[in-house]
UniProtKB/Swiss-Prot annotation:
It comes from the Bacteria. The lineage of its organism: Bacteria, Bacillati, Actinomycetota, Actinomycetes, Mycobacteriales. Antitoxin component of a type II toxin-antitoxin (TA) system. Upon expression in M.smegmatis neutralizes the effect of cognate toxin VapC47. InterPro entries: Antitoxin_Phd/YefM (IPR006442), phD-YefM_TA_antitoxins (IPR051416), YefM-like_sf (IPR036165). Belongs to the phD/YefM antitoxin family. Keywords: Toxin-antitoxin system. This is Antitoxin VapB47. GO terms for molecular function: toxin sequestering activity. One of its GO terms (biological process) is positive regulation of growth.
């Protein structure tokens, strides 16, 4: 079953299952498709962005090695530079207190 949801063509799960390669080729060419289950939109098939493809290519070629344990950079805490006892945050806080 095909329908249009908003500006996106929507296809039923059965239709997708029977013709997956046809629909994936359309998505790879840049088209967006919606997937419905019993007439209700449940998923969107969107093309992978060029930046994501580049990253994957770099990983496959061994140039880029992804983190083993990725972290949120906001959770990383600053450590004092070698040989120093104060962090940059400490210095900035002191400068603010002097003003």
């Amino acid at each position: 079953m095909r329908a249009t949801v908003g500006l996106v063509e929507a296809i039923g799960i059965r239709e997708l299952r029977q013709h997956a390669s046809r629909y994936l080729a359309r998505v790879e060419a840049g088209e967006e498709l919606g997937v419905t289950n019993k007439g209700r939109l449940v998923a969107r098939l969107i093309p992978v962005q060029a930046a994501e493809r580049s990253r994957e290519a770099l990983i496959e070629s061994g140039v880029l090695i992804p983190a083993r344990r990725p972290q949120n950079l906001l959770d990383v805490t600053a450590e004092p530079a070698r040989g120093r006892k104060r962090t940059l945050s400490d210095v900035l806080n002191e400068m603010r207190d002097e003003q």
